[in-house]
Curated annotation (Swiss-Prot):
Keyword Nucleotide-binding: no
Protein name: Auxin-responsive protein SAUR50
Organism: Helianthus annuus
Domain of life of the native organism: Eukaryota
Miscellaneous information on this protein: SAUR50 is more highly expressed on the east side of solar tracking sunflower stems during the day, while an IAA19-like gene is more highly expressed on the west side at night.
Stated family: Belongs to the ARG7 family.
InterPro entries named among the record's database cross-references: SAUR_fam
Length: 103
């Protein structure tokens, strides 16, 4: 009987799914389901830059290799086991440039 290990990407994806629902609503009004009113279905929130500005990002970005790299850097720098939301460790101008290329 062999053990099947989850890959790092699978583990990271599960962690991200958990915190997307848990952390995307800081400081915002929620509906009856607990989801933030201003975040459309199929999107999640990240916080970017020194000022931790809030951005709503489509879930489809999770498949992009550059975004996966940003998430890995976020996990290494901040971890995902906290109540602060997903913090992207890059300058806001760089994030906006990246996002404009893939959106």
């Amino acid at each position: 009987m062999g053990l099947i290990r989850k890959s790092h990407k699978q583990t990271q994806a599960l962690a991200i799914k958990k915190i997307i629902k848990k952390c995307s609503s800081f400081g915002k009004n929620n509906d009856d389901s607990g989801l933030p009113n201003d975040v459309p279905k199929g999107h999640f929130v990240v916080y970017v830059g020194e000022r931790r500005n809030r951005y709503i990002v489509p879930i489809s970005c999770l498949d992009h290799p550059t975004f996966q790299d940003l998430l890995q850097r976020s996990e290494e720098e901040f971890g995902f086991n906290h109540d602060m939301g997903i913090i992207i460790p890059c300058q806001e101008v760089d994030f906006l440039s990246f996002f404009s290329m893939i959106a």
